[in-house]
């Protein structure tokens, strides 16, 4: 009986912890499709984000890599053919979600209005890339409470 009480107490203590997790969201405000792969210890299937639509996943911890990279290209099968990639990555901890933005193999969204990473918590910092290109000398890693949603907007307008 004592074991059941301890087990129930442990489950009750863990439940709010696991329930209070935000989402990684990618909004496509561009005129063309964007292609996304969720990558941790393995590569998830290609997701097509059509103009005006959104991709969302609940923050999760990957036991193999520790974090998740949402790899985004402007061409189908882009992570397999050397196309420029924008990487919106996050790492979930007990209290925070660390997030960052980077490019590999070129700047996938160069020449667009911009890329904006914003959160549902106004106290957490934005990441803004005018013209879809990382500004020189700017920090691109930030943190927010783990229950906040964090959104990357493709072809975004400047933050207010």
Swiss-Prot record:
Main localization (coarse): secreted
Cysteines engaged in disulfide bonds, as pairs: 124-144
Subcellular location: Secreted
Similarity comment text for this entry: Belongs to the thaumatin family.
Protein purpose: Might be involved in the inhibition of growth of fungal competitors and pathogenicity.
Highest taxon, organism lineage: Eukaryota
Protein name, entry field: Antigenic thaumatin-like protein ARB_01932
Example of a GO cellular component annotation carried by this entry: extracellular region
Keywords for this protein: Disulfide bond, Secreted, Signal
Signal peptide: 1-20
């Amino acid at each position: 009986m004592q074991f059941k009480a301890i087990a129930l107490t442990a489950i009750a203590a863990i439940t709010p912890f696991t329930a209070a997790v935000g989402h990684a969201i990618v909004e496509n405000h561009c005129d063309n499709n964007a292609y996304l792969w969720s990558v941790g210890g393995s590569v998830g299937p290609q997701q097509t984000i059509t103009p005006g639509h959104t991709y969302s996943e609940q923050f999760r911890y990957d036991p193999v890599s520790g974090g998740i990279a949402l790899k985004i290209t402007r061409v189908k099968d882009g992570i397999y053919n050397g196309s420029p990639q924008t990487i919106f990555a996050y790492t979930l901890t007990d209290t925070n979600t660390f997030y960052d933005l980077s490019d590999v193999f070129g700047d996938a969204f160069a020449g667009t209005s911009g890329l904006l990473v914003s959160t549902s918590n106004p106290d957490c910092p934005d990441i803004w890339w005018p013209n879809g290109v990382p500004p020189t000398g700017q920090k691109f890693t930030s943190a927010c409470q783990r229950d906040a949603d964090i959104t990357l907007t493709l072809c975004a307008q400047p933050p207010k």
